[in-house]
A protein has these predicted regions:
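Catalytic cores and adjacent flexible loops of soluble metabolic enzymes
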Residues: 2-199
Length: 199
């Protein structure tokens, strides 16, 4: 990856055993063992690693996921050297109440500056979940141009929350994003054309 010009790598873990096996073809423990080797090698090469935890609220196969399960995986990733942990609501089931309970647990063991939010907009609640995360001190959020994305092992789940919607909400609420709104609009229109969506 470094030879190809990548200046950061990502590792994808899951708080759900079944989703881990479906998505990356190994157990949670097996994935963490692999990622420890990745983090060790990345540290030697001076390459930062970002950790992702899927299914932080619910799993499409197992149902509800406990905050304790999420904390176990997230803290393992931090201990092995991940610079930041992105908490992924893979199937978009999160509500603000879910996010509050989870962050109350996570922030006991990991500081907010090492946490990012990753919300899918399956049920139209992602912006509310971001607002709740902001109240808890989270300042980094994943999004995608035009709301594109998804996962073949998360049936029915929509893509990530749309970048332009997140930026509009943040600006309205007084946050600075550093994002060029005009360039973002062009990128969004381009993506909607590719996906065959009406603007």
């Amino acid at each position: 990856a470094k030879q190809a010009g990548a200046n950061e790598v990502a590792v994808f873990a899951s708080a759900s055993e079944t989703f881990s096996r479906k998505n990356i073809n190994c157990s949670i423990e097996g994935s963490l063992a692999r990622y420890e080797l990745v983090c060790r090698k990345a540290a030697k090469e001076g390459v930062p690693v970002r950790g992702y935890v899927s299914c932080i609220i619910a799993c499409p196969y197992e149902g509800p996921v406990t905050p304790e399960a999420v904390c176990r995986v997230a803290t393992s990733l931090i201990r092995m050297g991940c610079r930041e942990i992105s908490l992924g609501d893979t199937i978009g089931r999160a509500t603000p109440d879910h996010v509050t309970v989870l962050l109350d647990a996570i922030l006991e063991v990991i500081p907010p500056e090492k946490i990012a939010g990753h919300f899918h907009d399956t049920y139209g609640r992602s912006l509310d979940c971001i607002r709740t995360s902001l109240e808890r001190g989270i300042r980094v959020f994943d999004s995608s141009v035009g709301g594109a994305g998804g996962c073949p092992f998360a049936p029915g789940a929509k893509g990530n929350v749309a970048t332009h919607e997140v930026v509009q909400m943040l600006v309205t609420e007084g946050y600075s994003t550093g994002i060029d709104a005009r360039a973002l609009q062009k990128a969004t229109s381009f993506m909607e054309q590719i996906l065959g969506r009406q603007p």
